Amino acid sequence: MDAFSLKKDNRKKFQDKQKLKRKHATPSDRKYRLLNRQKEEKATTEEKDQDQEQPALKSNEDRYYEDPVLEDPHSAVANAELNKVLKDVLKNRLQQNDDATAVNNVANKDTLKIKDLKQMNTDELNRWLGRQNTTSAITAAEPESLVVPIHVQGDHDRAGKKISAPSTDLPEELETDQDFLDGLL
């Protein structure tokens, strides 16, 4: 016998046993089978009631006027309050900096949308965030001003002269503590 025939025979035997159990059921089997049917009927009626109580879906029209990423129905009240506070802060900052045109347009709206943020360049975003004296392009002179670490192989250089420790801007108390800890090492 192949595997398919064996499975088929086993299914048939199982179904026959189940039929015999149903035919020759004891009173307690009948009772519990009846209780299970009643539970299933209640569950199906509750599901039907839930399907009928399902709220009507919103139209697609609102998605053209609201940004669904920023909107959360559970925190709509909090968002409204936050938008008012942010709008006031933004207007105060704009009064200080009148040269930002895109930022002015955003401040006049009730809600800030992702589309508005994407349309702003870095200077406008920095003005909107309230950052001052920021540049939008990195100059080539900045990498040269980085501090290059000094690799010291000991207290003496190759010529045998003692190398002085690099000067730091630490207070004297911290320097003494640092010297003490270096001595322990």
UniProtKB/Swiss-Prot annotation:
InterPro entries: DUF5364. It comes from the Eukaryota. The modification N-acetylmethionine is found at M1. Residues 1-18, 26-47, 59-71 have a biased composition (Basic and acidic residues). Keywords: Acetylation. Residues 1-71, 155-185 are annotated as: Disordered. Residues 170-185 have a biased composition (Acidic residues). One of its GO terms (cellular component) is cytoplasm. Coiled coil: none annotated. Present with 1100 molecules/cell in log phase SD medium. This is Uncharacterized protein YER034W. The lineage of its organism: Eukaryota, Fungi, Dikarya, Ascomycota, Saccharomycotina.
